[in-house]
Amino acid sequence: MNYYIFILLSFLFFSSSLCLETCQPFNIGPPPSGPPIPGVPGTFLETYVVKEINDPFTQSKCLDGSKYKFLFTQGQGSGQKKWMFYWEGGAYCGYEGIDPVLSCSERATTPLGTSTIYPDDGETYTYNWPFGPMGYFSSLEEYNADFWNWNKVLIHYCDGSNHQGHLDNPIDFNGQQLWFRGYDNTNAVLKYAKRYLGLNDATDIMLTGSSAGGQATYIWTNYLQTYFPDTVKLTALSDAGFFMDTYNIVAECHFFRNRMQLLAGLTNSANSEVFRPCKYFRTNDIWKCMIAQYIVEDIHVPMFIVNSQDDVSALPSQVGLSCINQGPSTCSQCEVSIIAMVRAELLGHIDRIREKKPQWGFWLRTCFEHVYQSTMAWYGETMDVFNEAKNNYISLKDGLHQWYNGGNLLDVSTSIFIDVLDWESNPNCQLI
């Protein structure tokens, strides 16, 4: 067992070489048991208008080649000129440890690879995903007083490469054509919103997303920070997207880095405009432009980072700790030590960000969870994570309110919550 600690200590903080590491096969295992249980009945249902991109000059498509569609709800009253863009999450091709092309082939037949799940352009669609964009994306005033009446754009995730694909021609796989156009999809949404929805008149814009969409938020914020006029109050919020360049003890490689390198090459995302600001400084390490711990150095927009210190998605898939899926209490003492070291690495990154970026806010719990903007943070939890503030900590809702409404965002001391309890002694954690 000491072998694993030696491996992690040797590689956890190891800065990369330029070559692509070879990863050993591994299986992340099933997710934590138990079906998703909505904690607040009714708050998972949101109705949007479907918008279809029909501009022949865009290259937007989903993996299966279907026309790209996104969801929109019109702002009201004081929110008519305020906008929130939400990048939908859903992992990425190859996260399971299998070949990314095979993974994309399977994904293309699911809601994460097509737009055919949505009705025709102009029709309404009720979004009912248990981890869906509620919380700060909710249209219920009593639940989301700060942002309920904003214009909201849900950028559908259907390219499998973190909304970054930019490949001109499809990849043929067993007679199936796979299209990688994530960059083109987001670009088309922005142009559509400017041309038809009133984005040109925006006074406030928040860029946000969860999980893979949270990762996309870092990437796109870096690019879009010079896209909008200086008169716009531009902010960003990434939820569960701070995936690190950690070492996977089972695959015996920097697995997440490996997957990002493969995806960048497979989908030509490295040559899209979204990477231009980043790759200028990282010509030989373009893969770093897809990983939050490196991207944050270049982001100058005020940002609010929301993340678990013990991310129940990242620990199995990126570090190789599949014991998490059977419940953290099944992890060996060695594995518990590795969890603590990964948490320490995350907090080290956060401390460095806080020193350099005083306008940024933070909300980080030490519970085995993933995605906080929804009512529930993971399988089996029934607590209202967005609203609840038990045991003397700041709720996500209150922290976000204090950060966003802090005038010039120079004093964010009341909107920083970094849990100091570990998961074993944290009364706020349900999944132990």
Cite the ranges covered by each PLM segment.
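Cleavable N-terminal signal peptides of Sec/SRP-targeted secreted and luminal proteins
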Residues: 2-19
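C-terminal His-loop and adjacent cap/lid subdomain of alpha/beta-hydrolase
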Residues: 18-432
